[in-house]
Design a protein with these regions (language model features):
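Histidine-acidic residue clusters that define the catalytic metal-binding segment
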Residues: 14-31, 167-206, 238-243, 272-274, ...
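An aromatic/glycine/proline-enriched structural segment found at the starts
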Residues: 10-20, 207-272, 431, 438-466
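Flexible, processing/modification-adjacent segments and terminal tails
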Residues: 184, 473-480, 486-487, 541-602, ...
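N-terminal mature ectodomain segment of secretory-pathway/periplasmic proteins
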Residues: 476-555, 580-585
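M16/MPP (pitrilysin/insulinase) zinc-metallopeptidase core fold and M16-derived inactive scaffolds
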Residues: 53-115, 175-179, 291-307, 320
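Gly/Pro-enriched, hydrophobic low-complexity segments
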Residues: 536, 592-677
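Acidic/histidine-enriched segments that form metal/cofactor-coordinating
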Residues: 11-18, 83, 92-196, 242, ...
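M16/insulysin-pitrilysin zinc metalloprotease superfamily fold
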Residues: 82-85, 113-143, 273, 292, ...
Length: 677
């Protein structure tokens, strides 16, 4: 007990211990050699596990893709799917048989295997690098997948926001700001892909990194054998105009009528290289501001206000122009307030010195990450690769912790004022203008000056301020709107003769083809079956009063509220029974004005010009919170004299959509007895 008392008297646990000197770091350098074609090879031997990893990086000068943006993505998807010497199926089957993997990215490639299979995998890897298989069928398939992915992302607020903010930051003609479109992808030909490969896939700017259970001698012998004949090409160097910051802080707004939350990006350009003296102060300043969970921005917006799941910042460092960006996603109701709070935190780090304790916590975080990374053999190679590609001092990582430890509170404030440009911030907000724009227009700078708002479409083109006021004739009622819709699709008499409708639709979910069969009757019975490869994987059944859903062998009965919601809409044409529906306003749907009809917890949107239903919004409550599901209808076609939509797009989560294409409608079919049990 005496010993414990003395020990307790010697340590003041209310004070953070004074940090000691930065630990001495010894970093083993990889063994290297270079082929005559310019390929630089790095080898890190590690014999703890019988496996090998290979990375190919082509460090080309910055270049754009001009009128064929997306060609590099198509090339990356095609490479590694067979070679000029081995067909696709044989190639992939052999890799799978060996328990290995080979993957390609944009001007990069990766492979991994057990060490005993490394010679064969390197042969297959090298063959794919030197002799890609440019098959028309594969080209068309990969291009189609890219187009489908692009279509699926067009209603994603996050995807559109990212596209616009990078395009505005760097410019649409700059490699970092360019983006593709469906029209551009459609115009890309196989010859463009071949030309891109011939121009930019060169060993002269390439690095090959081999890490694992190998010897330098064996790797050198194998690489010389497999890659010495990789043809060297002179890669063109192109100059681009240097992007500029906005002259004054401003809001750039992108209207997304389907947005349930706003995407915010507060951006300015920076010129920062990893070799600059400011590099270490800057990464620590950013970490304090928003580089982690305990960053100032996240503590404010998430922990204090509860407005978001996360609010962070990042800053780039490299040979080319970079940017600082603070980003978050918030509810529509707090969009303007979130913008103001981010601006406040940027000012705070510029004007209020951070505490020594906060700085030491950030240093400790970077130190811990750095030390843990060194435990991985691949880190040695990655550091050596970065020294080469970023023109760093050979001892950059040897001195990493020393440089980090030398950063002072004064350094943090100095670089915050230099790199977080309060007066030149581009604040890109992508959201639902009808709910957030008035609040954004009322924001002033922290000094009380007006904050200009500019408007852009989904492709970063400047447009006029959107309008949301849609005049509704005083004589228009819910009954008028519904009757117009009924007449537009076939007329009341024809619709009343429909006793049941069955539709069959196809869709793709996470790359897997699915089929959906849906049946509804005038007795408010409902059946949905989702099938994959002919097997039912999900099912919903409602007999008019009660029902259930089942998936993966698990059955869950509908509760009272779920049953009531299904009963309300489980009709071939619920509008025929919508006695209590009311006209609640008008909104733009896909840029066109539509009347909004409320029927219980469901809203129907009808195009003012065509009268057709273009959107259904169902609101449900779960765990005390309301959420809405939007389903868009389009491509109406005639079936047995009735106009029905052949395409529906359902927003299943923010940024996620399920698109179904109806292959057939069957009206008044004979139904199996007991199918709704």
């Amino acid at each position: 007990m005496l010993f414990i008392g003395i020990a307790g008297a010697q340590i003041d646990r209310s004070k953070q211990p004074t940090p000691g000197p930065a630990p001495s770091i010894e970093i083993t350098k990889p063994q290297t050699f270079e082929l005559k074609n310019g390929l630089k090879v790095m080898v890190v031997e590690n014999h703890k596990l019988p496996q090998v990893r290979v990375q190919l990086l082509i460090d080309n000068p910055m270049h754009g893709e001009a009128n064929v943006v997306g060609v590099s993505s198509i090339l990356a998807r095609m490479m590694g799917n067979g070679t000029a010497n081995i067909d696709k199926d044989s190639y992939n089957e052999e890799i799978d048989y060996l328990g290995a993997s080979i993957n390609f990215g944009n001007e990069s490639a990766f492979a991994s295997s057990l060490s005993k299979y490394f010679p064969r995998i390197l042969t297959l890897f090298a063959d794919a690098v030197k002799n890609p298989l440019f098959a028309e069928e594969e080209f068309n398939a990969q291009k189609s997948r890219l187009i489908e992915n692009l279509k699926a992302s067009e209603k994603s607020v996050a995807e559109v926001g990212s596209r616009v903010n990078t395009a505005l930051t760097y410019g649409k003609n700059h490699p970092k700001g360019e983006f593709t479109t469906e029209e551009v992808l459609e115009g890309i030909q196989l010859a463009n892909v071949k030309n891109y490969y011939d121009t930019f896939f060169s060993p002269s700017n390439a690095y090959l990194v081999v890490v694992g259970d190998v010897t330098f001698k064996d790797v050198k012998k194998l690489v010389k054998k497999e890659l010495s004949d990789w043809k060297k090409r002179d890669v063109p160097r192109v100059t681009f105009n240097t992007p500029k910051d906005v002259q004054y802080t401003q809001i750039n707004f992108v209207d997304m009528p389907n947005a349930v939350q706003s995407e915010i990006a507060v951006i300015n350009l920076v010129e920062l290289k990893m070799s600059d003296e400011d590099y270490f102060p800057v990464i620590l300043a950013n970490h304090i501001l928003g580089g982690g969970f305990n960053g100032m921005i996240n503590l404010n917006l998430r922990e204090d206000k509860g407005w978001t799941y996360g609010a962070y910042s990042g800053i780039g460092a490299g040979k080319e122009i970079q940017r600082f960006a603070a980003t978050t996603s918030v509810r529509n109701q707090v969009t303007d307030s979130a913008v103001v709070e981010i601006m406040k935190e940027i000012r705070n780090i510029r004007t209020v010195p951070v505490t020594e304790e906060r700085l030491e916590v950030s240093k400790a975080s970077y130190t811990g990450n750095f030390v843990r990374a060194l435990e991985r053999p691949s880190t040695i190679a990655q550091y050596a690769l970065r020294v080469e590609t970023q023109d760093l001092d050979p001892d950059f990582y040897v001195n990493y912790l020393k440089k980090l430890n030398e950063v002072t509170v004064e350094d943090i404030q100095r670089v915050a004022n230099k790199y977080f440009k309060e007066d030149n911030l581009r604040i890109v907000v992508t959201g639902k203008g009808s709910e957030v724009l008035e609040g954004l227009k009322s924001i002033t700078t922290l000094d009380g000056k007006p904050l200009p708002v500019k408007y852009y479409d989904r492709f970063a083109n400047e447009v006029e301020e959107p309008t949301y006021e849609i005049e509704i004739d005083a004589n228009i009622t819910a009954e008028n709107v519904i009757n117009t819709y009924i007449e537009a699709i076939g007329g009341k008499d024809k619709l009343q003769n429909v006793k049941n409708i069955t539709s069959e639709a196809s869709m793709t979910m996470q790359g897997m083809p699915l089929t959906m069969k849906t049946t509804v009757t005038t007795d408010r019975q409902y059946l949905l079956e989702v099938s994959m490869s002919g097997m039912v994987v999900q099912k919903q059944v409602f007999d008019g009063e009660k029902g259930y859903q089942s998936a993966q062998g698990q059955r869950l009965d509908f509760d009272e509220e779920q049953a009531a919601a299904i009963k309300q809409t489980a009709l071939p044409f619920p509008e025929l029974e919508a006695k209590n529906a009311t006209l609640v306003g008008a909104e733009f749907v896909n840029g066109k004005p539509a009347y909004v009809i409320q029927n219980g917890k469901t809203k129907w949107f009808y195009d003012q010009e065509t009268g057709l239903k273009v959107l259904e919004r169902i609101t449900q409550e779960m765990q005390g919170q309301e959420f809405s599901t939007n389903t868009y209808f389009s491509d109406y076609k005639e079936f047995e004299g009735i106009m029905l939509p052949t395409k529906s797009t359902t927003e299943i989560a923010p940024g996620m959509e399920a698109e179904a294409n109806v292959d057939s409608y069957m009206i008044n079919e004979s139904l199996d007895e007991g199918m709704f049990d």
